[in-house]
C-alpha cells in the first residue's frame, strides 16, 4: 500500500482555497499511484477555527466541501479533518472529526 501525507498551508474559513488545495493534492497522488492520502486536522476549514464553528453556515460549508472532495475520491482513499455535529444526546455539540472518503 502506498500512503501519502499531505502537509499544506490551509486558511481559516477559506473553503474554496482549502478544497482546491486538497483536490489538487489528491489528483497528484492519483498520478503517483497512491492508495491512501492523509490530510491534517481541520484541513477543510483551516485550524484553529475558533468561534467560527459556532455558526451553522460555517459547518454547512464544511460539509459541502467534504462532499466536493468525496467526488474525487474515486480510486484513492482520502482521510481529511473537519468539524462534525454530535448526533448523540450527550457531549459537546461538535466534534473535531476525521472523514474517510472512498467511492
Where are these regions (language model features)?
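Hydrophobic structural segments
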Residues: 1-103
Amino acid at each position: 500500500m502506498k500512503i501519502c501525507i499531505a502537509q499544506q498551508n490551509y486558511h481559516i474559513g477559506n473553503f474554496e482555497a482549502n478544497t482546491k488545495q486538497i483536490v489538487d493534492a489528491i489528483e497528484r497522488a492519483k498520478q503517483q499511484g497512491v492508495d491512501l492520502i492523509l490530510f491534517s486536522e481541520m484541513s477543510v476549514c483551516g485550524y484553529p477555527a475558533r468561534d467560527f464553528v459556532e455558526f451553522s453556515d460555517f459547518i454547512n460549508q464544511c460539509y459541502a466541501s467534504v462532499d466536493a472532495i468525496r467526488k474525487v475520491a474515486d480510486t484513492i482513499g482520502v482521510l481529511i479533518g473537519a468539524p462534525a455535529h454530535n448526533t448523540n444526546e450527550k457531549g459537546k455539540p461538535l466534534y473535531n472529526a476525521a472523514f474517510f472518503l472512498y467511492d
